[in-house]
Each structure stands twice: as C-alpha cells, then as structure tokens.
C-alpha cells in the first residue's frame, strides 16, 4: 500500500472520528437525564431505530440528532422529480447542471432539516420533565437554538460526507451511516448479555440470535459478490501471421444492482415519520398510527418490504443504462456474440438487468425483514431487523473493493512509469 492510499484511509478515519465527536455535543437547554430515561423506555420502537441510525446521537440530543436523513430524504425527492421531469434529468447529466442540481438538493435539505428540527422541539415538550417537558429554557428561544443547532449539525455531516467521497475512500454518506450503526454494536451486545443475565432471554435464544446474524451476514456476502458475466468480443487487427486476433472480455452485472440505497431510502421514509408520531402521546389517533407503524409490527415491515422493492427497481434504472453501455461497446468495436450492435444489444442487456433486479430486490427486501420475523417468532423482547446488518456488510464490501481498485490502479501507474 503506497502513501497516497494510506493518506486517503487516514483522511476517511479522521472525518469519521470528527463525526463521532459531534455525536457527543448536545443541544443547549435540554434535560439530558430526562432524554436518556425517555429513550431507555422507548428503545424498541421507531425512536430506538432512528437512534441506531444516528449512532446514538438522538438519545444524547446531539447537534447531529437528525443525522444525514434530511439529506437522504431530499435526495429521494430529487431523484423522483428527475424521473418525472426530463429537464431535471438532463440537468444531472451536464457538468454545470449537476452543480445546480446538487445546490437544489442542499437547499431542500435545509428546508427539511428546519421542519424536522421544529417537530423534534415540539415533541420534547411531551417528555416528562419541567413545565416544558425536557426543555429547560424558554420554548421559543429553544426552538430557535435547536433549529440552528440541528441545521448546523446536518450541514456539517453533509460536508463530512462530501470530503470523504472526494478526498477519502468510499461513499461518504454511506460510511457515515455505517459508522453510526457500528458505534452502537458494543452497547447492543452489552444490552443483550444483560438480558441473558437477568433471565429475560435464555441461552438458546442467544444462540439463535447469533446464528441468525451469521446466516444474514453470509447471505449478504454471497449475494453481493454474485454477478452475471456477459461475454463480449473486440475484433482488433494485429500484425501476427497476417491473422485477426479476437480479444475476449465480459460485462459484469451485479445481482444487486441498486446496492445499499433501497434499504437506506426505505428506512428514511419510514423511520422519521414514525418517530415524530411516537412523540404525540396526547393525541390518541396519532399514537395509534405510531403504534401501527412500530418497527416491531407487521405493518412497518410490510411497508419496508414494498418500499425496498420499489427503490431497487427505481435506482437500478438510474445506475444501469443499457443504451449507454451498448453505444460505448459499438464505439469501441465491441459486440456481444450472436447479437447485433446497438438496439439489439441494448434490449438484451435491459432484459438481463430486469431479471437480476427482480431477484436482487427480493433479496434486499427479505434480508431486511426475515431476521425480524425469526427473532419475533423466538419471543425475543427487542427489535432486530436485517437492515442494519445489510448496510454495514454492504458498505464494508464496497469500501474494500474501492481500496482494492485504488491499489491496482496505483500498481498500474507505477508499471507504466517504468516503461512496462
């Protein structure tokens, strides 16, 4: 490993460390003891799940309590709008247009952050504490302070994510979510053993949980490394005994084309609304809706299943453009044996991608929901879904592949420099 790659890894770790430091900076004017007690008693619902994705920043009411979710939500909205309005889609493909597009995403993130910050501030009044619940200062002052603090925190996370993507290794936003989930693993393990010690769950249940986790990890690794290889040929004339030499190659198409995006998008759409509704303890109707959408309920997991399939198809159509691949092949003198270059190749690739996306979307949806079904059947008293495991393993694999690719690229440049 050369110095450039080592430097990128250190930069990535440095920014992730900064992210974890921010998770310990609380918003001024709140009763942290009341907040902690509230989250201890609500760890099994949407609040607990939202807290997990934020790296326990919510339970500390940190300035990054909203995490990167406002940015993800704004990205979802813009992607859906791009699919609806051709001019917006065209803007994304241009260099200057992409800058304008990202600027719109940032402005939308600011708006969503402010709306969510106000919602959180109002919800804090329902937490047992003083006259204003867990709020220890004037309510109007706190709403301004909390909105500014959370907006600053979310903007900092966006900046950290962009810096990691540009200067570090891997996708910055995915790594932030990865770091948040991983940071909660020690406390989750400790809490599980406490349940064993107190007799809430027995040894057989613990062994069952471990086996489910290991089986989930194995399934994720197996599918994430699976790909369909489409053979292609490049006809090139070479001066070798006056014969043409065909150089064979292939197009790798992953079984899971959409990657980690569908479960992240689905979680973003379900978790925060459920969290806000969970705080509406005074309204019986809203509380009933919150209970209905609890992560431990069937409705939440059915919606998660359906949303993941939708986003898998939607995002696969964005990341895999069969027409562009077919055009690039034709320009470079490549072709798929038995198929006509151009439209015939594009149709074939689109058909293959559609079939793979069907199985890939089902895989994502099942991995995100089946572990919960198994754990619930065992009678375990806490939520365990495969979404967190899926995100952690997928991001780890993707980051390792990018590091490996940069190492190979570095070796190639070294060989080119010495004349090989």
Curated annotation (Swiss-Prot):
Subcellular location as annotated: Cell inner membrane
PROSITE patterns: SECY_1, SECY_2
SUPFAM superfamilies reported for this sequence: Preprotein translocase SecY subunit
Gene Ontology CC: one annotated term: cell envelope Sec protein transport complex
Classification via InterPro entries: SecY, SecY/SEC61-alpha, SecY_CS, SecY_dom_sf
Membrane topology according to the record: Multi-pass membrane protein
Stored Gene3D superfamilies: SecY subunit domain
One annotated GO biological process: protein transport by the Sec complex
Coiled coil: none
Main subcellular location: membrane
TM ranges: 9-29, 61-81, 104-124, 141-161, 173-193, 203-223, 257-277, 300-320, 355-375, 377-397
Protein family membership: Belongs to the SecY/SEC61-alpha family.
HAMAP family associated with the record: SecY
Subunit: Component of the Sec protein translocase complex. Heterotrimer consisting of SecY, SecE and SecG subunits. The heterotrimers can form oligomers, although 1 heterotrimer is thought to be able to translocate proteins. Interacts with the ribosome. Interacts with SecDF, and other proteins may be involved. Interacts with SecA.
Protein name per UniProt: Protein translocase subunit SecY
Provenance organism: Helicobacter pylori (strain ATCC 700392 / 26695) (Campylobacter pylori)
Lineage, highest ranks first: Bacteria, Pseudomonadati, Campylobacterota, Epsilonproteobacteria, Campylobacterales
């Amino acid at each position: 490993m050369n110095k450039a790659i080592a430097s990128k890894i250190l930069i990535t770790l440095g920014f992730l460390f900064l992210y974890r430091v921010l998770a310990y900076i609380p918003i001024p004017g709140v009763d942290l003891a009341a907040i902690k007690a509230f989250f201890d008693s609500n760890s099994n619902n949407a609040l607990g799940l939202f807290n997990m994705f934020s790296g326990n920043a919510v339970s500390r009411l940190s300035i990054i309590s909203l995490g990167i979710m406002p940015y993800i939500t704004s990205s979802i909205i813009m992607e859906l709008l791009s699919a609806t309005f051709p001019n917006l889609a065209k803007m994304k493909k241009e260099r200057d247009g992409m800058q304008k597009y990202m600027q719109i995403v940032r402005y939308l993130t600011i708006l969503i952050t402010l709306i969510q910050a106000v919602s959180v501030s109002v919800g804090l009044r329902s937490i047992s504490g003083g006259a204003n619940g867990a709020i220890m200062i004037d309510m109007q002052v706190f709403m301004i302070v909390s909105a500014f603090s959370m907006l600053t925190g979310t903007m900092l996370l966006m900046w950290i994510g962009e810096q990691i993507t540009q200067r570090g290794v891997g996708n910055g936003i995915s790594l932030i979510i990865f770091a948040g989930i991983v940071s909660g693993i020690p406390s989750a393990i400790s809490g599980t053993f406490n349940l064993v010690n107190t007799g809430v769950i027995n040894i057989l249940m613990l062994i069952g949980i471990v086996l489910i986790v290991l089986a989930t990890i194995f399934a994720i690794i197996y599918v994430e490394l699976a790909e369909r290889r489409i053979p292609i040929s490049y006809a090139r004339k070479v001066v070798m005994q006056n014969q043409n030499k065909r150089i064979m190659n292939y197009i790798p198409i992953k079984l899971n084309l959409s990657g980690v995006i569908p479960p992240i998008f689905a979680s973003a759409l379900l978790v925060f609304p459920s969290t806000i509704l969970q705080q509406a303890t005074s309204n019986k109707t809203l509380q009933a809706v919150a209970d209905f959408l609890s992560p431990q309920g069937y409705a939440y997991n059915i919606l998660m299943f359906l949303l993941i399939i939708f986003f898998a198809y939607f995002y696969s159509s964005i990341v895999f453009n069969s027409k562009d691949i077919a055009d690039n092949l034709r320009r470079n003198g490549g072709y798929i044996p038995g198929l006509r270059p151009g439209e015939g190749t594009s149709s074939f690739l689109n058909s293959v991608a559609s079939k793979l996306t069907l199985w890939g979307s089902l895989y994502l949806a099942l991995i995100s929901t089946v572990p919960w079904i198994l754990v619930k059947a065992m009678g375990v008293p806490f939520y365990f879904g495969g979404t967190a495991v899926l995100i952690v393993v997928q991001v780890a694999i993707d980051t390792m592949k990018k590091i490996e690719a940069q190492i190979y690229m570095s070796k190639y440049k070294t060989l080119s420099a010495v004349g090989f």
